[in-house]
Amino acid sequence: MQPSRGAGSALLVVALTAVLVMAGTAGAQEFLGPPIEVYTQNAGKGARIVPSGQLVIDRHRISCGNRATVLDPNLDDYGAAYPGYLILNPKLLEKVPTSVKLWIHAHECGHQFRGSDEEKADCFAVQRGRRQKWLTAEGLEQVCAFIGPARGDSMHFAGPERCQAMRRCFASSDVE
């Protein structure tokens, strides 16, 4: 017995829906990045997870909501973020002042709450630092000295433009 024309169309709709759902799921997994345990296992020697609320940087206990931080000495930058967790390179961080270390953590935390926009993450970081009293005007200038030489790229403005925007955020009472 052959299926009726209507049954064939219904079967095609079900098959296409399944393909679209699976494609959407694959895309979502790709966007979310690897789970923290998978990242840590693949990061190489020395990577470890610090649970939320247990990270201490230069005698400052810091957190990013309920998100853990991976300390990864093999990371090719000072910090990074995937949705749900932060990544810091302790070997690179030991070379910069405390205000810069805390700003880097807060910047990566900003991505958790403000998304991928770098300017919003910068603003989040300096406003958080000001509110939590670990970032002063002098500390902001240390951050600006740190990023000042940076060239812009597809995600970041050049260092001087980023500093100008961060100074405005630091001075503003509006939470951004």
Predicted regions and their residues:
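Active-site recognition of the HExxH zinc-binding catalytic motif
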Residues: 103-112, 122
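An active-site-proximal "capping" alpha-helix that borders the catalytic cofactor pocket
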Residues: 116-132
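Sec/Tat signal peptide C-region and signal peptidase I cleavage site
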Residues: 24-28
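Bacterial N-terminal signal peptides
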Residues: 11-22
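Catalytic zinc-binding patch centered on the HExxH motif and its immediate surroundings
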Residues: 55-84
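Long, well-structured alpha-helical subdomains associated
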Residues: 134-176
